[in-house]
């Protein structure tokens, strides 16, 4: 297992240990104690807002430790956040199964909540019987629906002196001495982010003071994915390889695909390739657990495996090497338009034929068979569903698409001539045949010779409203 990060090793266990946030901590205590005294606050959610590394997440876990709560941590960046909150919200109604530990639902990165899910999350807050705490770097980017339901607690940016004092305390507990000028440089570059400063301190201590300036400067440079791959595959040094994802604007999941793709191009020995893939598979396990549980602290173990684990797997090619983008991303990029067209067709089937998504998917298979074997019927379906030219090509293929599209255009013109609006095509009223407008001279004479009473009866009969019947799809196609 990798060495425990100092950020976790020295994370405060009590609220009183949190650096220079006394006013915020006082508000948090008052809020949580109102729950414990049986008088839940008016606002059942707490929103901790402040810059990165100011102690927001640490507050939640110190609070849970001090008051004996269990923390259920979720991340708002996850697309399935609302689903997870819905699944776990039962924990906000009741205590633990044994009734011994209450739960805190902790929603991190609340400023990344999608507006579409904000109203639903706000409803869940209203139902809560146990505390819900959220954290955000940018308060103004938290959806209004959430802000209105939460009590705001502001965290101030830590000063350079605050950061320095915290670093010195860690060094004393480790029994290590670091030159003062290096500590000053770390504190200065952190911009009040204590978490980043502690990570930098550990990196400098592990890597050696002589490289401290280079290591710290490296944090300020945004890398490309090719530079990151160069660190992984261009060095046998695990410590250096771990720096690969610093300032890389890419998620660990995506970077894993890049590393995975390039292993067979860079390693020479089959056994070493297998060892590198073993590290990749372990990284993938950690990423999967993080996604399922919302515990994104597991990312650090995944990153260690996909960088340092791969770097030390064996001998690599020397000299100029070419890096390749992952086939997975290439396939997804190439199939993006195709997937969008398929989804559009499914939605049109659902709308026009009034069926579920699963039924629509099965129906599309049948429609595809029709498009490949019956061009006339395919043209009718094109008009009925309102398909575009690309959607027709998706269903029939390039060779037949032109013919079907031409027939569909002709059918649309015919429908317009008949006065049938396309938006009414799923349900058309088929009127009973009207009497022929042009009658022969003999028929006109017969009508004139009829008694007046018969004429009156016929007139009343004509004035009666004509009955229509609801057309089916097959009636429409027959036209």
Curated annotation (Swiss-Prot):
Species of provenance: Pyrococcus furiosus (strain ATCC 43587 / DSM 3638 / JCM 8422 / Vc1)
Source taxon at top rank: Archaea
Lineage: Archaea, Methanobacteriati, Methanobacteriota, Thermococci, Thermococcales
The record's note on its domains: The C-terminal basic cluster region, which consists mainly of lysine residues, is important for the formation of a stable RFC-PCNA-DNA complex, although it is not critical for loading PCNA onto DNA in vitro. An 11-mer corresponding to the PIP-box inhibits DNA synthesis by Pol I (pol).
Keyword ATP-binding: yes
Family assignment from sequence similarity: Belongs to the activator 1 small subunits family. RfcL subfamily.
Record gene name: rfcL
UniProt protein name: Replication factor C large subunit
Function: Part of the RFC clamp loader complex which loads the PCNA sliding clamp onto DNA. The complex possesses DNA-dependent ATPase activity which is further stimulated by PCNA.
InterPro entries: AAA+_ATPase, ATPase_AAA_core, P-loop_NTPase, Rep_factor-C_lsu, RFC_lid
Record note on quaternary structure: Heteromultimer composed of three to four small subunits (RfcS) and one to two large subunits (RfcL).
Region (Disordered): 424-479
Biased composition (Acidic residues): 430-456
SMART domains, sorted: AAA (SM00382)
Family annotation (HAMAP family): RfcL (MF_01508)
């Amino acid at each position: 297992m990798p060495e425990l990060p100092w950020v976790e090793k020295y994370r405060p266990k009590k609220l009183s240990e949190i650096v220079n946030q006394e006013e915020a901590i006082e508000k948090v205590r008052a809020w949580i104690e109102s729950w414990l005294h049986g008088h839940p606050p008016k606002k059942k959610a707490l929103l901790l807002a402040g810059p990165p590394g100011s102690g927001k997440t640490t507050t939640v876990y110190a609070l849970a430790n001090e008051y004996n709560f269990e923390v259920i941590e979720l991340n708002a960046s996850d697309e399935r956040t609302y689903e997870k909150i819905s699944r776990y919200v039962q924990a906000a109604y009741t205590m633990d199964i044994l009734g011994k530990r209450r739960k805190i639902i902790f929603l991190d990165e609340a400023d990344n909540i999608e507006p579409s899910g904000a109203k639903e999350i706000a409803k869940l807050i209203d139902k809560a019987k146990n505390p819900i705490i959220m954290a955000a770097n940018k308060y103004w980017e938290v959806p209004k629906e959430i802000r209105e339901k939460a009590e705001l607690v502001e965290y101030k940016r830590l000063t350079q002196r605050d950061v320095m004092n915290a670093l010195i305390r860690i060094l004393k507990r480790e029994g290590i001495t670091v030159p003062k000028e290096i500590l000053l440089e770390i504190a200065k570059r952190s911009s009040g982010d204590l978490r980043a400063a502690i990570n930098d301190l550990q990196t400098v201590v592990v890597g050696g003071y002589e490289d401290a300036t280079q290591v710290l400067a490296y944090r300020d440079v945004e890398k490309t994915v090719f530079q990151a791959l160069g660190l992984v595959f261009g060095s046998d040094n695990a410590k250096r390889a771990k720096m690969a994802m610093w300032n890389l604007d890419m998620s660990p999941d995506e970077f894993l695909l890049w590393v995975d793709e390039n292993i067979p191009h860079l390693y020479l020995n089959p056994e070493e390739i297998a060892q590198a893939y073993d590290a990749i598979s372990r990284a993938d396990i950690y990423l999967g657990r993080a996604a399922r549980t919302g515990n994104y602290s597991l990312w650090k173990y995944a990153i260690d495996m996909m960088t340092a684990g791969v770097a030390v797997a064996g001998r690599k090619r020397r000299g100029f090497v070419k890096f390749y983008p992952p086939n997975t991303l290439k396939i997804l990029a190439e199939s993006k338009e195709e997937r969008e067209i398929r989804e559009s067709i499914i939605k049109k089937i659902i709308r026009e034929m009034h069926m579920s998504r699963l039924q629509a998917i099965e129906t599309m298979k049948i429609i595809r068979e029709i498009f490949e074997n019956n061009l006339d019927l395919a043209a009718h379906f094109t008009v009925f569903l309102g398909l575009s030219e690309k959607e027709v090509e998706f269903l029939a293929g390039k060779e037949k698409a032109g013919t079907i599209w031409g027939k569909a255009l002709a059918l649309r013109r015919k429908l317009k001539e008949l006065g049938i609006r396309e938006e009414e095509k799923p349900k058309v009223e088929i009127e009973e045949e009207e009497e022929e407008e042009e009658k022969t001279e003999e028929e006109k004479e017969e009508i004139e010779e009829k008694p007046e009473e018969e004429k009156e009866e016929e007139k009343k009969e004509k004035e009666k409203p004509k009955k229509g019947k609801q057309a089916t799809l097959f009636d429409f196609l027959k036209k």
